[in-house]
Amino acid sequence: MGMTLSAPAAPPGRADIWIVIAAFNEGTMIGEVVRSVKVRGYPVVVVDDGSHDSTAEVALHAGAHVVVHPINLGQGAALQTGIKYAVHNDAHVVVTFDADGQHAADEIERMTDALATHNVDFALGSRFIGQAVGIPKLRVLTLKAAALFTWITTGVRLTDAHNGFRAITRDAATRLEIYQNRMAHASEIVSQIAKHKMRVVEVPVTITYTDYSLRKGQKLSNSVRILIDLFLGRISR
């Protein structure tokens, strides 16, 4: 799983809903993101995926549990580590949440409520039935292509197959095994939803694109990499 730097006591209230954040060189934003979640009473685990900056230290100071990968394994592997950590610590619900400030912490409750309201295993955030503030046109095209590819290969039709904002029941989390270490893990999760016949609902969420998040993850090379990883992931299984 990696080296654990901290295990602070869970805050009062909502202690069975764990927030999992995969982070790589996010020292600039991770403290603010962790605090935005902690103030709402959720325990948080940050998986520092081999960062070269102060990500782990900043997250620890902000009050997160921190698990460190000695080397960078990719977002999929970091999420797998975080989900297992949360389940091990008696999470009844696991929420995956981005480290770069794109997600809104005040929408976590909407996501977790959707699990019970719709009696589903997964609540998946969608920026296309919600809002995508400042999204680049290239990113829209890439995400639409990824959603189409995912629908064709899994039979699960979603508007936003690559949204990192998810709420997952404990039972579903224990069955989830992420093998794709890079961005294709998102479609792999949908593939497992189909394989295990798990129930899913999409929930409108707001994704805010900032100069920081655009520099971090919205390059053309990353968009192309998503599609390459999807293709390679399918032919290798």
Regions found by a protein language model. Give the residues of each.
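N-proximal low-complexity "stem/linker" segments adjacent to membrane-targeting elements
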Residues: 1-36
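Residues at the starts of beta-strands that form the adenosine-phosphate
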Residues: 16, 43, 199
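Conserved sequence signature across two-component system core domains
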Residues: 23, 47-49, 69
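A conserved acidic beta->alpha catalytic loop
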Residues: 48-56, 101
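Catalytic donor-sugar/metal-binding loop of nucleotide-sugar-dependent glycosyltransferases
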Residues: 157, 178-181, 190-208
